């Protein structure tokens, strides 16, 4: 057992720290009970501010705003942001990364569209190397109109809003950068965490975000824009402020629109007095003109531990609010439900308990911790799972229980300052000791590891007044700072990180000081490998999961979304449910950089059976992203990304750094497919007739499908290319299947045969496309028994809970054997054996074996052996 890294303590926790030398999390009693007896309770004290709010406060401090020292320390604002302002070689900071053939453009689903127009934007040099990228995307859709938004950090340079938006009037083919969202009052500005929504009845769009009111400065409130499209332009109809911050910090707001009632619902994290968070809910029943008093939804026991809430509306006006509740060692996703349009809420329910990797974000993430906020969506389609709520999250293996050696060998840092070639070698399990003499003093260590090993490194001894930057670096390219592939980053007085190695090789630990002394700043780092515990859901340091519920109370067993190898990272899973009831989830994914796991694409998976089964993952974005690049300050992935859908169309919206500093992108993926059947046809007995079925991809992305052709009477005599098979169809492609049907001369066993064509979507499990047609047979005259052909008709009924009728025809007299067999091939019952004449014959099976015992429900096979051939039919038995 080992300690988790201690947090930046608040002033309120100082007495506790002095008494226990531990930073106790603000946890529920239940959480404390979940911790094993030997597991030390040593973790971060509550949740952190969102990326948008942290950036906002840093800017205010840079401009001279004075905040209480306790708040600065509470949020880690007493040290500079991690911007990698030094390098081994002069002038390399803004150089493009040397990725060579590894960073190649590929084809995702549909074509990516860049949403922002960088023309006229400030350059890195003119902005004093302040960050200029975009992140935290959101998108809403209504017909051909799309409205997207993003955090836009160019506002840190211009002094304008730190939030941008843009629109498309042609379904996402082209986009207009809308610039800065207008302020409700002069002098105010939007400050990020954008959320967009639309009323599906009226077509009104809504833009919500954090807002800086000139009357209270950095203590953020909320602002809301309502608008519509006219003449190819987004027109603002109203601009209001749902909530003022006052002395509180309002953070990570979210918006939902009820198209049934027209109500607006907003939730947010209220850091009361700027300190500890609670989830609050407000609503408007008059289209945003006025707002209710806040309802506190999170439990008092979770005070300080909650973040990332999202309101959602079901098809009957039911309101859900989900949020993240930090705990140690287990965190939780929570939910409450309202059945009176948000006037009141039922009791808090737990969606899941999970181990989280809160120490570091995905590779290239430049904040010293990681958010584990939920994604969520409700099925409002007319499909079979209408009303179902889906929630997604990131989850880690339980590396908290990885044992540090009791008496480890100590390795003392001795390399030349900041040079990888002379990095101090060590073996995982050793204890590292060193010290930094100044803010430019960089310590480097190197070790070897194998693919699939999960490490946990934690600095458990350091000066309380010193904040360290500690990161894991891949050995792929360490020649210049701008090419480093930064896999983890922890910024803390007691930094730590966990990571599953994606390849065999050498890896580096890099450590320097973020604060301004005192020097020398000494430290001790414990190192260990984690051994997976049986029963853990996650396979490595971060996987993506989903669960669903039809009422918010009873939840399904979580299902793994990503199908990559169990040693690649991924983060920020978001989910939507389209108009057919299919669910789609997507996230940042790092599987396509096998040597380091530092380069990312967006990936998606889909479910057509209500979230029980998810299809093979598909790449969404067209180009790789290198988040480690240090263009215009540090890249920032933010805390979330956006996705929405309507009809068969799905719109993922994300940010990536393919062009250097990150930009927002979106695409319109149409998953539209169908099965086509020919009209009914007639045929004479003993003759062939052809029926041409078709599988059509009317969408704009490739799809893979499996098809079958079946009939009731047994007239099906083959198909071209086959009666069952699979095919991958490009956009707008068609697969024809031509079936041959040949009834007997006397049209046995019925005059009309029903022929069915069914196609299953391989990438959207549970989604099928089917149609049927009929073939009517006219008996030919003077048909003799000899005109019959050997055939075994489909069992009737099938499946059956009792007696099954088995009919067959013989074209000539001869020996016959008809028996039932189990799926394993063992004989169950002999039904007929001996000489029979040509013509139609029938036998029955009563669900018993040769000894007269009832057999178990399951799949069996009727096998006819006659005329030197063997024919078989499946028989389903239910009890």
Indicate residue ranges for each PLM-predicted region.
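C-terminal PAP-associated
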Residues: 33-407, 528-686, 698
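Residue-level detector of functionally pivotal "anchor" positions at catalytic/ligand-binding pockets or at interdomain
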Residues: 406-415, 419, 672-684, 773-795, ...
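Acidic, Ser/Thr/Pro-rich low-complexity intrinsically disordered segments
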Residues: 431-520, 529
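Surface-exposed binding patches on compact interaction domains or structured appendages
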Residues: 465-469, 700-735
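Short glycine/proline/serine/threonine-rich loop/turn segments at secondary-structure transition edges
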Residues: 518, 597, 745-754, 851-858
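Terminal connector regions
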Residues: 745-777
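Surface-exposed, proline-anchored Ser/Thr-rich loop/turn motifs
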Residues: 784-813, 821-826, 857, 874-879
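C-terminal tail/sorting-segment detector
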Residues: 853-879
